[in-house]
Amino acid sequence: MTAAFFAPAAYYSEDWKLFQRNEWMGTTGKQVNDFKDMVKAFHKENIAVIMDVVYNHLSEYEIGNLKQIDKEYYFRLDEKGNFIAQSYCGNDLKTEAPMMRRLIIDSILYWMKEYHVDGFRFDLGKLIDWETIESIIREAKKINPNVVFVCEPWGGGYDPQGFSLRGWGAWNDQIRNGIKGENPNDGHGWIFGKWYGNNNIDRIKSYVNGTLIKDKHGLFQKKEHSINYLESHDGYTLGDFIRIGTGEVKRDSIINDVDKNVKLSAQQEKLNKLAALFLFTSQGITMIHSGQEFARSKVIPKNIDVADPHKGMIDHNSYDKDNETNYINYNHAEINYDLLDYYKGLIELRKTYEAFRKAEYENINFTEVPDNKFALAYSLKYNGYEFLVMFNACQNIEAKFPVAENHWEILVDNKKAGTKSLGIAPAEIILSPISGTVLKRIK
């Protein structure tokens, strides 16, 4: 998207065996029909297509682009005529320029009309000026009143509230850092029994509620504006963050056996499950990254024919790698099948019971947990159902929660998750370190 704003990349539609460097690709136009067929196939399964778009900077490698047409008009420059690069990608587009704004809007409308895309996720959304954002909303809704807009609410600033006021969803990096942490070496979050930055139990409760502005440190007007996530294309995968965070793998370790590295230890599996349970039971929109459900690991292959001082190590910034570092190895789903099955159960739970998506703020009630600052418990009600959700993120002590005996059935524990009963809850729930549970009231 940073080169051709109106065309799908032919590379992903070509037979890679016929790929030749320094030769034109996509001359048959096959990629256009392939993309349209893909959208049709998703729509047939009632799956919306949200496309990642980049309108804040331009590719550094394309010939005949806007740099050659009119650098001063299309780009933000400093007083010496150099590119401003708050995107950290070499240049920032001047989205406020009328013809740049028109290009962006025309591109959005084209993807909606020609390819029937249902929505867009904007890279570094804060680098796009508000007038352009509002024009996009106005014009796109003429085509589809239900068009979806999501963004990274940073880049040249940080303003999730500004996007929420305009009806956009935004990636919630606060829940990401608060729950997981920011750095696997010395910036651990709640699942590790730590407070990252200015996080505390009240912020954790706010994340459960959808990080709403009615809470002291909230960001969003509506819970559906909070895109809750713990892993994306940037940074370590959640699985690798936990591998390094436990100290079982070093950041600069050379991985000689990738399959062995992928296999989760008991401690790593508990942390992955606790993180997933919090993510899927929090109000807002749940986002997971490809392979997160089986703790995918990004290991740079040793046998690549390019110079890389980090060969054999876990990668934390793999944007530039078209090799096994970024390929999804589904054999690893079998290696960590218990985690995969846990994710499947949590997805089923969230889809079946709307309480985990639509519970009103007033119907989520927290219970104080004495003597364990990393334990959390709350009840939620919606549409005739009532649930108890309990967590113990402490690393070394149990958490005890009294409940009414014979009134609750267990749907999630530290091993299984889903909608089938795992048994009747006793009068006291005892959670071992790094675990959680979900109970449903028996009608």
Language-model features, listed with the residues they occupy:
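Solvent-exposed beta-strand/loop surfaces of large extracellular or lumenal domains
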Residues: 411-426
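Substrate-binding/active-site clefts of carbohydrate-active enzymes
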Residues: 1-115, 125-128, 133-144, 148
